[in-house]
Regions:
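Positively charged n-region of N-terminal signal peptides that target proteins for export
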Residues: 1-5, 21
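Active-site-proximal alpha-helix that buttresses catalytic centers in soluble enzyme cores
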Residues: 21-208
């Protein structure tokens, strides 16, 4: 039922954006459809590329999470900090929390993050736990290729948004990685369909 509620919205958005692209060679600039948000954290730009593609395809609004103490552009330079935060389930500060009233208007929130030490970036958890997300639809996406890491990262997002509704609804151990991720890489971050053959548009159709 949860997926069915999202199908018309995503497919309508995809169709509308595709129609616009046939008459205008310039990139679309979404104005936002009012009830969907793409919320993401990105260090190297991989997650950002996918987040921006989702916005282009759906017309959602977008917000990039910034850490109060910025991470290095290359996460390997911050590996000790990242590992410490992940293994100890810490909550680093967020520099740009949204007003609670501003977030409350969204019914559907895409949540994007790299997988760091089998977890989403902990700053994403800090952000999510700052709000009442009861009954909102949360759709996680990640940039990393290992299915084990993706399952563990999904479990963390589900845990910190336990009162929300989730797509996918369940998380079996053998979950197909393509159902929850469109991994980005430095050499394909600017490609129309990053990460795999079906790309972001195919992923949206699968989850929708």
């Amino acid at each position: 039922m949860k997926k069915l509620l999202l199908i018309p919205l995503l497919l309508l958005s995809l169709t509308t954006m595709a129609a616009c692209s046939t008459t205008d060679d310039t990139p679309d600039t979404p104005s936002g459809n009012g009830n969907m948000l793409v919320l993401y954290f990105s260090a190297e730009g991989h997650t950002q590329a996918i987040a921006e593609r989702i916005v282009k395809l759906t017309g959602a609004d977008i917000h990039r999470i910034e850490a109060a103490e910025p991470y290095a552009a290359n996460p390997y330079d911050d590996s000790d900090r990242i590992q410490h935060e992940a293994y100890n389930d810490l909550r680093p500060g967020v520099a740009n929390l949204l007003d609670k009233e501003a977030l409350a208007k969204y019914d559907t929130i895409f949540v994007g993050s790299p997988c760091w030490w089998h977890q989403p970036a902990m700053v994403v958890c800090t952000f999510l736990e700052a709000y009442d997300l009861k009954d909102k639809v949360i759709i996680p996406f990640f940039t990393y290729g290992a299915t084990t890491y993706l399952n563990e990262s999904m479990q963390k997002i589900y845990k910190v948004t336990s009162t929300s509704r989730h797509i996918p609804e369940t998380l079996p151990e053998d979950l197909d990685a393509e159902d929850i991720t469109t991994p980005g890489r430095p050499d394909d971050a600017d490609i129309d369909m990053p990460g795999n053959a079906n790309g972001t548009e195919g992923w949206l159709h699968r989850i929708g």
